[in-house]
């Protein structure tokens, strides 16, 4: 990319990501409640005042309001601008990692699904089918288009389907094993579907890496919560956010991590 154009391209990616992040905040709040995603327009969750154009600008609107509703002065959660900024950062990181090609737009879709599912799971301990199923289908379609571009569409599609099935079966086994060990539901039924979606998008090697990272980070989180006394031994916590973190790490650095691991465990002669 031309050095003069690159900064503008990254700024465009950040701006687009922040705008998408603003919509993802709406999805995370309204979808679990069964509300429309487009009507009514954004408003203060406390007093119901409709936000104006300036107040709706991602990140900047929250800063301009100093984190409070202009009418009722109730504090507005900083999560809103943080989600917007994080989405903008991830969109720019995708451009930096993969360049400006059509696959980048596909990965933006994956990132959007992962963020919205993370927020919903964190809030409600659920991963709605209305997001995991379309995310799975779009992942398969992504690999269908990728294969068509390369002249052999059937192979990437079959690999994506196999990876999706592996994700579903793997996490169903983990779920059943956890239930046997704990004597209760060890994992929600949405986690296998999210794993299936990740497999469809990233393939089985990255799915396995995602699983390892998610279990590792999730174990640390759960252990710390137990030590601090903020989590009971038989109390569950959302696992979807850790799957999403693992998927993002696999998306950006999975190939290098897998190669480094194979070089480490493979004998050198």
Curated annotation (Swiss-Prot):
Textual note on the cofactor: Zinc is required for the N-terminal methylation of the mature pilin, but not for signal peptide cleavage.
GO cellular component: plasma membrane
EC number assigned by the record: 3.4.23.43, 2.1.1.-
Reaction equation(s) it catalyzes: Typically cleaves a -Gly-|-Phe- bond to release an N-terminal, basic peptide of 5-8 residues from type IV prepilin, and then N-methylates the new N-terminal amino group, the methyl donor being S-adenosyl-L-methionine
Assigned keywords, A-Z: Cell inner membrane, Cell membrane, Hydrolase, Membrane, Metal-binding, Methyltransferase, Multifunctional enzyme, Protease, S-adenosyl-L-methionine, Transferase, Transmembrane, Transmembrane helix, Zinc
MF annotations from Gene Ontology: aspartic-type endopeptidase activity; metal ion binding; methyltransferase activity
Keyword Methyltransferase carried by entry: yes
Places the protein is found: Cell inner membrane
Biological process, per Gene Ontology: methylation; signal peptide processing
Chief place of localization: membrane
Transmembrane segments: 4-24, 100-120, 127-147, 154-174, 197-217, 238-258
UniProt similarity note: Belongs to the peptidase A24 family.
Name of this protein: Prepilin leader peptidase/N-methyltransferase
Source species: Synechocystis sp. (strain ATCC 27184 / PCC 6803 / Kazusa)
Lineage summary: Bacteria, Bacillati, Cyanobacteriota, Cyanophyceae, Synechococcales
Gene: hofD
């Amino acid at each position: 990319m031309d050095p003069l154009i690159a900064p503008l391209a990254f700024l465009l990616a950040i701006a687009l990501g922040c705008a998408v992040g603003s919509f993802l905040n709406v999805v995370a709040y309204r979808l679990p409640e069964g509300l429309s995603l487009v009507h009514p327009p954004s408003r203060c969750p406390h007093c119901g005042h409709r936000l104006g154009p300036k107040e709706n600008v991602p990140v900047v609107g929250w800063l301009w309001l100093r984190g409070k509703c202009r009418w009722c002065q109730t504090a507005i959660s900083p999560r809103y601008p943080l989600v917007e900024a994080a989405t903008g950062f991830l969109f720019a990181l995708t451009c930096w990692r993969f360049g400006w090609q059509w696959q980048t737009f596909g990965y933006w879709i994956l990132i959007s699904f992962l963020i919205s599912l993370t927020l919903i799971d964190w809030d409600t301990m659920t991963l709605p089918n209305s997001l995991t199923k379309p995310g799975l289908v779009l992942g398969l379609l992504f690999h269908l288009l990728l294969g068509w571009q390369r002249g052999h569409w059937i192979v990437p599609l079959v690999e994506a389907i196999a990876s999706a099935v592996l994700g579903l079966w793997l996490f169903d086994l983990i779920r059943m094993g956890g239930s046997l060990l704990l004597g209760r539901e060890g994992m929600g039924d949405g986690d296998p579907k999210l794993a299936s979606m990740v497999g469809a998008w990233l393939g089985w090697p990255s799915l396995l890496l995602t699983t390892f990272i998610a279990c590792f980070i999730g174990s640390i989180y759960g252990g710390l919560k137990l030590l601090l006394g903020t989590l009971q031994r038989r109390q569950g916590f959302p696992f979807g956010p850790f799957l999403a973190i693992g998927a993002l790490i696999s998306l950006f650095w999975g190939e290098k991590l897998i190669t480094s691991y194979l070089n480490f465990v493979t004998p050198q002669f």
